[in-house]
A protein has these predicted regions:
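Short alpha-helical segments and helix-capping/turn motifs at coil-helix boundaries
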Residues: 35, 99-100, 216, 297
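Extreme N-terminal leader/anchor segments
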Residues: 1-56
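Assembly/oligomerization interface modules of large self-assembling protein complexes
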Residues: 43-111
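Surface-exposed acidic, glycine-flexible loop patches that form ligand/cofactor-binding
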Residues: 154, 158, 219-224
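Amphipathic, alpha-helical segments enriched in basic
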Residues: 13, 17, 24, 83, ...
Length: 335
């Protein structure tokens, strides 16, 4: 059974009329009367996902990151106001134990596409359209990468996300659970991880997001340092983002107040963000949004021996996701 399955998987694709580009499908491309053919004449959107993700190369079938807890604040040792009696035990150090966290697994998925062209169409076509087909195939592959990379952010910026990250919470949440649940003295750690501001982009919500950035905590609830330096917005918020971060005067007023947000953040306009009233800030150096190339786009071509049909295909393999929610703070309406 396995051998038969492998034979089926490895069997070459036989060209058919329906799957092959033929002269009869593009008859006008064989005639010299056309002034211009509109194909592959538009500029491609530059690569954007690499401005957001840490782009890495993988040599394994999957990549796994692992989180652990953290030590809690020390407890008092002894009593400075009294002497230990002869029959009383001396103070003892309270030893802590860090707890295991959660795995973050990146499983690389495969993507492929291609096209076929009959021999005489290659010979007779007069406008170099066929020569442009491989270029457009590569362009379509790059577009697929952009669509995939933005998907978890578009999902997280929804009013009610349905997809969660490794900790069973949306990427942007008020209640990210911490690994450690008890302090060294046995009391409950009540702090939760919070990286969400409810509301639309404004001077007030942006200030609130930056303030929240100073309140980020580790897995034991201890304050940590994150340097939020970038505001990522959809095209619909580009001009507002520029007003908030680039103008000298306070936006929206005729007073001579200074704009305290000026120069505080770089702005990235991510054309593939679809939620027009939501955005996020990020620490571009310390965030853990990762994109792994297992196989970068690889292209090949061959001629079918019997049909003389020319085949072109491309293949790529990658994964992406988050190893930590820290490093991102969302600003979005909650309804």
């Amino acid at each position: 059974m396995l051998i038969e399955k492998l034979k089926y998987m490895l069997a070459p694709v036989d060209p058919t009329g329906a799957s092959t580009h033929q002269e009869n499908d593009f008859g006008l491309l064989l005639e010299p009367k056309l002034r211009k053919v509109f194909y592959d004449t538009y500029k491609e959107v530059p690569e954007q996902f690499s401005k957001i993700y840490n782009v890495k190369t993988s040599k394994k079938a999957k990549e796994t990151d692992y989180g652990v807890g953290a030590f809690r604040p020390w407890t008092q040792f002894g009593n400075k106001m009294s002497t230990v009696g002869d029959s009383t035990s001396m103070p003892q150090v309270k030893y802590q134990k860090i707890h295991p966290g959660l795995e973050r697994t990146y499983v690389h998925e495969e993507f492929a596409s291609g096209f076929m062209v009959e021999r005489k169409f290659v010979d007779d076509e007069m406008y170099d359209v066929i020569e442009k087909l491989p270029k457009d195939l590569a362009r379509a592959g790059r577009y697929k990468v952009e669509l995939d990379a933005v998907t978890p952010f578009n999902e997280a910026l929804k009013a009610t996300p349905t997809a969660n990250i490794y900790d069973s919470q949306p990427l942007f949440s008020h209640t990210h659970p911490l690994v450690e649940t008890k302090n060294a003295d046995g009391t409950t750690i009540t702090v939760k991880g919070d990286n969400l501001i409810d509301g639309t982009l404004s001077a007030d919500t942006l200030k609130a997001a930056l303030l929240l950035g100073r309140k980020q905590v580790d897995e034991a609830g201890k304050l940590i340092v994150m340097s939020f330096d970038t505001l990522v917005v959809p095209p619909a918020l580009e001009w507002l983002a520029m007003e908030l971060t680039k103008t000298t005067g306070k936006p929206g007023t005729e007073l001579n107040d200074i704009n305290v947000l000026k120069g505080s953040l770089n702005v990235i306009v991510w054309d593939f963000l679809t939620k027009e009233d939501a955005c996020f800030i990020m620490d571009s150096k310390n965030h853990q949004a990762n994109f792994f190339w297992r196989v970068k786009p690889d292209f090949q071509s061959e001629k079918d021996f019997d049909s003389l049909v020319k085949k072109y295909n491309g293949y790529m393999r990658y994964s992406y996701g988050f190893s930590d929610w820290r490093g991102f703070i969302g600003i979005k309406p909650n309804a």
